[in-house]
UniProtKB/Swiss-Prot annotation:
It holds the Pfam family Ribosomal_L28. HAMAP family: Ribosomal_bL28. Keywords: Ribonucleoprotein, Ribosomal protein. This is Large ribosomal subunit protein bL28. SUPFAM superfamilies: L28p-like. Belongs to the bacterial ribosomal protein bL28 family. Coiled coil: none annotated. One of its GO terms (molecular function) is structural constituent of ribosome. It comes from the Bacteria. The keyword Ribonucleoprotein applies. InterPro entries: Bacterial_rp_bL28, Ribosomal_bL28, Ribosomal_bL28/bL31-like_sf, Ribosomal_bL28_bact-type, Ribosomal_bL28_sf. GO terms for biological process: translation.
Length: 72
């Protein structure tokens, strides 16, 4: 299963974890994804999507219209 947000396109990033002794170790930083069931009013149906926390705030502010365009 992919770890990509449907709305924002956020995906895992790679970088270094740095210890107090300044040792660098490669790591993968995962996006804050949640699987949600969202009601799309325009199509009168439920959609199960993976959304980041930022995407959930966007939907709360603007509604599901933008999400409906992406799911087509």
């Amino acid at each position: 299963m992919s770890k990509v947000c449907v709305l924002t396109g956020k995906r895992p990033k790679y970088g270094n974890t740095v210890s107090h002794a300044n040792n660098h170790r490669r790591t993968r930083f995962e996006p804050n994804l949640h699987t949600k069931r969202i009601w799309i009013e325009e199509e009168k149906r439920w959609a199960k999507v993976k959304l980041s926390a930022k995407a959930m705030r966007i939907i709360a502010k603007t509604g599901t219209g933008e999400l409906a365009k992406l799911l087509k």
